[in-house]
Every structure is written in structure tokens, then in C-alpha cells.
Amino acid sequence: MIEMFAALALAAASRDEVPPEAWNCRNQVEVWCAADGCAASRPEEFTPMDIWASDDGEISVCAYTGCWEGKAAFARVNGRLVWAGDDLAFSTAQLSTDPGAAGADVSLMIVSGEGVGFVRAAGLATPVLCVRGVRGQG
């Protein structure tokens, strides 16, 4: 009887009450790419990244002293999760005198069955390892 009540309660819950699926990604190397090629940073110059993305399109890519954050287009494609955000603001851009620091196009792709992904933001083009998670917990 309790199981039936629980099933009915879950069925009656609206889609808005279900938290979005979220992923947390971290890098083990730092790679930069431009039109003329790519290069990996030396281990002593490695900058760890903290990336959060959810299936409601929210994305945060943190590196250095701030984060590119905002809403991105989200798609599921054959076991891949893809986020694409245009001109996402950098959280410390107001402190910068660099006019290019205001925003960046951000792309994140995760192969959900493996937890392996790739992030591209402001010159960074870096492989990442990802796990499902809840932001702010763990």
C-alpha cells in the first residue's frame, strides 16, 4: 500500500519539482588552442578547473580567479551531453581592463556513459573527467 502511494505521489509531481541532472567536471591537464595550433601547459603551470553544468542549460566554467557563467543551449545526442553558450560573462570581468574579458563562447561535451568530456572557453581546449553530482554537496 505504501509503495502504491509513493508511486502515485511521484507520478503526480510536476516536472519543475525534479532537480535538473547536473555534472561536475575537473581537468588533469590544461590545453590551449588557437588557429595556429594547440599546446599543453607545463605541469607547474597547470590551472585546475571546476565545471558545473545541468540539463536545464545552466553552466559554470571556473578557472583562475573567476567563472564564465550563464545559460547555454543543451542537447542530448546519442549518449553525449552538449552545452553551447555564447558570450558568457566572466565573474571578475568588471575588475579587468581587458575589453575581451567581458565574455566568452563556452562549449562543453560529455560522453555520459564514460564521464569523459571536453571544454572550450576563451582559448582553453581541455579534456575533462566528469561525474554526476549535486552542486554544493559533497
Regions found by a protein language model. Name each.
Residues 57-100:
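Contiguous, well-ordered beta-strand patches that form the walls/edges
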Residues 23, 27, 115-117, 128:
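One face of beta-strands
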Residues 29-32, 62-69, 120-126:
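Short, solvent-exposed aromatic-acidic interface loops
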Residues 103-119:
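Low-complexity, intrinsically disordered Gly/Pro/Thr-rich segments
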Residues 43, 120-138:
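Edge beta-strand at a domain terminus
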Residues 2-15:
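Hydrophobic h-region of N-terminal signal peptides that target proteins for export
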Residues 31, 39, 43-45, 65-68, ...:
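Secreted/processed peptides and extracellular or luminal domains of membrane proteins
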Residues 19-59, 94-97:
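Short, solvent-exposed loop/hinge segments that bridge or flank secondary-structure elements
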